Amino acid sequence: MAKQIEAGKFLVIECTAGELMDAVGSDICICDWCGQPYHLSDKGCYIAVLNHWYCKKCYEEWVSRAEWYPEDADVERRNFNFYAPRLGVKCQ
């Protein structure tokens, strides 16, 4: 089940490839960083500030070096508020 996870100030939703595919109406889920396709049950993270879904490996690499900028907060919140209900996550 999709859930919001702690990632500093970033708004991130952990979800399976299948949950993301259902939310966006896609037939395939590909990591937006490495380009690899993933099975329905594989977990990854939707990163609202990037409006991307990363596999767990790419997410861990990204979050270790990511820097939050306050000027991105409005777009990040808008993206999160759009996808969170589609993934079954309550907007905060």
Q: Where are the language model's segments positioned?
A:
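Short functional micro-motifs and their immediate structural scaffolds
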Residues: P37-H39, V63
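Residues immediately within or flanking Cys/His clusters that coordinate Zn2+
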Residues: S26-C31, H52
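Short metal-binding segments enriched for Cys and/or His
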Residues: K56-E76
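A broadly conserved sequence feature marking short terminus-proximal activation segments
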Residues: M1-S26
